[in-house]
Amino acid sequence: MIRNMVFDIGNVLMDFRWKEYMRSLFGEDETLIQTINQGIWHNGCWAAMDKGEMDGAATLRSAVAFAPQYEKEIKLTLDRVALAFHKCDYAIPWVQELKRLGLNAYYLSNYSAFSVEANPGVLDFILYMDGGVFSFEVKAVKPEPEIYRCLCDKYGLKPEDCLFTDDVPANVKRAKACGFQGIVFEGYEKTYPLIMKALR
């Protein structure tokens, strides 16, 4: 019997619109955007922040070292990154609905301290949840098995009593391998009824 609903956060309970954000800063300058993306994302900085191995200052230094000609633009990108995070209007009502059904609601997310501090307001749904795990807190990221075990150990959960949803199929596949039930999140309109049917 499922007693616990476990959510990913990014692009599930909160939208992370990086491409839209970058175009709002730099228009259609694809060379600039691709270079900054390379310096922040593809060299592993963002993933290292998610894992608690780097902070924002270290990411800035690394990205600037990769593309010193764009130092000003890289700093602007990181300074205004809060604008890439957007609330989902359905997040709090959904969590509240689960609570009314007598279920527990948790989060399990690849998320950095930098992102939490950049825009804490988009995480307001957490106040209505029973808890959760951010990857930076435990130095493990999905789909590493350790992060799923960390959630269960922290709250005394049995994996078979948990339903996990994430927009990344590999993360759901790993959750299932760890004993969770799982549904890939493919947008609220499509996935909400599937999850609620599985929970009832």
Regions found by a protein language model. Give the residues of each.
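Hydrophobic alpha-helical core bundles mediating ligand binding, dimerization, or RNAP-core interactions
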Residues: 22, 40, 59-64, 78-81, ...
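Active-site neighborhood of HAD-like aspartate-dependent phosphohydrolases
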Residues: 1-41, 177-178, 187
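Short, surface-exposed acidic
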Residues: 28-38, 67-79
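Asp-based, Mg2+/Mn2+-dependent phosphohydrolase catalytic module
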Residues: 1-7, 112-113, 117-200
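A metal-dependent, Asp-based hydrolase signature
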Residues: 46-77
